[in-house]
């Protein structure tokens, strides 16, 4: 589905992603291996296509085998070297085995992009323990498991590495998504802590603070949240290409002196923090 300013629920097709102009040179990531968790989602697909067209071998993982197979068909048609693996990012043993397999198959791992996530909007009193755990474990635990597994291999092999966490606007506080707010806050602080601890091993750890980007996932919010999708100084939604190119900037030599950075890709949303995932209740309205 083609994205447009009029349809916040649409996104780019893989073919459209592959044909869009980019500021990055061809072959920028040639001979590199890039792992993308949550690789079959809309942001994950954009990451796979961009890094692939810039020369990388892409390894995508995710929960849904069917969605990964669909992604694989698209990447094959675009002549992007790749492989896909179905796994549960919330299972540390599966994640560790997956990272081992990447090294065994490819002999290297250059960049890990922790993109797996997910959320739903609901009043805090109605979120079940299962719903809370699903979001927090996917975002925070999944980032930790994958980062630790990758770093262990890099350190053991005395190899440099780069970790990029696809996160959200730093300091975001919003009603209706307390599980996501908690998980993302932990993910951002984890980014900073690991950047400090792993710097002696030439492992850079950064994050992209993503604002509201167009795509089908916005259907998870009720209609009265729609007016707040563009609650940023640029008064528009971002798109998946904005996120993918920010990650490429951090992964490329352009980011070689960056670690512990949370790069906002949010249209200035971090300085205009009004976001109401369940819509704005009358209690918070200020009359003129």
Residue ranges: model-predicted function:
Residues 123-124, 128-136, 228:
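Substrate-binding pocket helix/loop in short-chain dehydrogenase/reductase
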Residues 155, 164-186, 191-200, 212, ...:
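Catalytic loop of short-chain dehydrogenase/reductase
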């Amino acid at each position: 589905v083609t994205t447009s300013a009029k349809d916040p629920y649409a996104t780019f097709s893989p073919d459209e992603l592959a044909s869009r102009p980019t500021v990055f040179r061809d072959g920028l990531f040639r001979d590199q291996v890039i792992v993308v968790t949550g690789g079959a989602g809309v942001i994950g697909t954009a990451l796979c296509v961009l890094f692939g067209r810039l020369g990388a071998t892409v390894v995508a993982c995710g929960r849904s085998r069917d969605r990964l197979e669909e992604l694989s068909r698209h990447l094959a048609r675009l002549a992007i070297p790749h492989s896909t693996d179905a796994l549960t990012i919330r299972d540390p043993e599966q994640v560790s085995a997956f990272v081992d397999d990447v090294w065994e198959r490819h002999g290297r791992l250059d960049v890990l992009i922790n993109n797996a996530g997910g959320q739903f909007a609901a009043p805090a009193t109605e979120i079940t323990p299962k719903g809370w755990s699903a979001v927090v474990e996917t975002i925070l635990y999944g980032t930790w498991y994958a980062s630790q597994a990758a770093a262990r291999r890099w350190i053991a092999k005395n190899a440099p590495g780069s970790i990029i966490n696809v996160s959200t606007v730093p300091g975001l506080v919003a009603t209706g998504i307390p599980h996501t707010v908690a998980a993302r806050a932990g993910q951002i602080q984890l980014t900073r802590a690991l950047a400090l601890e792993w710097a002696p091993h030439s492992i850079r750890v950064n994050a992209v603070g993503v604002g509201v980007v167009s795509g089908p996932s916005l259907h998870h919010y009720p209609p009265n949240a729609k007016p707040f999708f563009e609650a940023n100084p640029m008064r528009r939604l971002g798109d998946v290409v904005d996120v993918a190119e920010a990650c490429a900037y951090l992964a490329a030599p352009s980011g070689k002196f960056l670690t512990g950075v949370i790069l906002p890709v949010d249209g200035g949303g971090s300085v205009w923090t009004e976001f109401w995932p369940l819509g704005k209740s009358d209690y918070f309205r200020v009359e003129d």
